Amino acid sequence: MIENAGIDYKELYLQMQSAVVALSKTLEEIQKENKNLKEENEYLKRKLFGTKSETSKSLGFEQLSLFDEAEAEANPDEEQFILEEVKFNKKKKYKGQLDDKLSKLPHIEVIMTLPESELVCPVCNSKLVPVGKKFVRHEIEFVPAKLKVRDVYTTTYECRKCRANGKSVMKSPGIPEPVIPHSYASAESVAFVMKQKFVNGVPLYRQESEWKQMGLDLSRTTMANWIIYSSEHWLKPLTDRMHGILLESKHAHADETPVQVLNEPGKKATTKSYMWVYSSIKESSYPIRLFVYAPNRCGYNPQIFFNGFHGTVISDAYSGYNNIEGCVNAYCWAHARRKFRDSLPNNLENAENTLPIIAMNKIKKLFAIEKEIEALSPDKKVKIRQLKSKPLIDDFFSWCKSNQNATASAKLSRAFKYVLNHEEGLRQYLYDGYIPMTNSLDERVIRPFTTGRKNWLFSASVSGAESSANAYSIIEIAKANGLDPYKYLTTIFTYLPSQDLIKNPEIIDEFLPWSKFVQKNCK
């Protein structure tokens, strides 16, 4: 018989019980983590392989990618979640639609005639004479780009009478300054290179081959130097001036997107840098879109940009915008909606009463109100928002607080946490008719940059990234002011180099996109 040798079975039992509890807790945590990872995996698979457009009218939301969240307000009147088959109706063509489309293009007439030998009547052999012409069709003719060289000379004039009297009096016309000193670059060629890269997304290595096909060996290095010099000397004074104008306003949009810079001092080539985008609001008399390069995503970047600004910053609630002195933060409801959309269950067949759908339908009602009051004055918007939107928002946040702990989904928990943590900023639009419900304006401004980034992938240097920021700024500002970006760039590069901005800094205002001179010449 084996003796117990003084073993305290009660203590041993308690230890084993404690171990079982600890193991059960560990197992529960592992199962929870596993569930969250499965949820995240399914979400990423939907993002990667799923449909790129929504098929539900009740959702009514466009696909919101990371930096490309257009405000999806179309068809917000459906309040219940009902999946529907999308029907594609052929767009009806109206008489005169093609004529309107072609009206801005130059027209030439091509008149088909009979040869002289056939101008004979088949009945009596008399000569046929023209009695009218009948329109047959329009054809679009493509004229390939061609290069030519402008050989610039200056004429020297002399007074012969003074010469006869032993005096030498000569006079020559002033010569406009070139866009780049000691270069064969013209205003048009630099503007074209920028348009191709920053409007059409054509990287310099592809432009290099296109220029060669047109008859000129123009290296990508030369084009890069053109962009950097012209941006620094002629575009930056304009973006600096418009930065000052934006700081004088009371509202501004802000957003940011990553960019890779290869040769940045003190950083690995794989490290993320950022392009920050700041814009005036839709109602502004001076539409401004400014791209600013920064080596990181730290909050001091917007703090530096908004130094001296006293107003409301509309953003996606990124914490980097929280500590801007003198600023009120208004947050984007499209981002709030996206948090719930990302937490949707994989199977939407019986999703009508799930928490994400309920949340999205509550937010959808707010978007429907904004659609109704879109054309109203800011004062009237505030009145209707207080009357209609505020009760819905009160109900929404009350509902979120009641249901925030009623889910095991990590994504849905984060969605509740997001909206509750940013309630004050999400409510700001209720009190100011100039504040939009979303930050979609800045996200649309970023879109050309993110599209172009897919083609050129990275900037080779800090100076290249900064020049890209100035170029994107001027191009997006041109679009916002109804200008042709190529014409605006050409005008800047043609006239600004001959101006003395140090002695006459006020002359820069003549080149702002809303000036009479620019509006007349750059449409």
Regions found by a protein language model. Give the residues of each.
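Short, flexible loop/hinge motifs at secondary-structure junctions
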Residues: 1-181, 224, 253-254, 385-388
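Catalytic center-proximal scaffold of phosphoryl-transfer enzymes
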Residues: 3, 10, 156-158, 163-523
